[in-house]
Amino acid sequence: MMNRLLVFLMLGAFMLVVSANDAYGGDESLGKRKSCCPCWLGGNCFWGQNCYPQGCSGPKV
């Protein structure tokens, strides 16, 4: 049980770092980044739309 919780926390921290890095290091505005959902999450994020509306191999919005 403890291991499962640890993995969950590590994943959460990693996601936070990745999204913060995208928001501040990206060339796009923070607002656009924030409403963009990565393809590997299936495009079903609670914070925004899919980055790739025409499919994962299509152009990024």
Curated annotation (Swiss-Prot):
GO terms for molecular function: sodium channel inhibitor activity; toxin activity. The keyword Disulfide bond applies. Disulfide bonds join C36-C51, C37-C45, C39-C56. One of its GO terms (cellular component) is nematocyst. InterPro entries: Neurotoxin_3_Anemonia, Neurotoxin_3_sf. Residues 21-31 form a propeptide. Residues 1-20 form the signal peptide. Its main location: secreted. Pfam families: ATX_III. Keywords: Disulfide bond, Nematocyst, Neurotoxin, Secreted, Signal, Toxin. The keyword Nucleotide-binding does not apply. It is found in: Secreted; Nematocyst. It comes from the Eukaryota. Belongs to the sea anemone short toxin (type III) family. Sodium channel inhibitor. 5 uM completely inhibits voltage-gated sodium channel (Nav) inactivation. This is Delta-actitoxin-Avd2c.
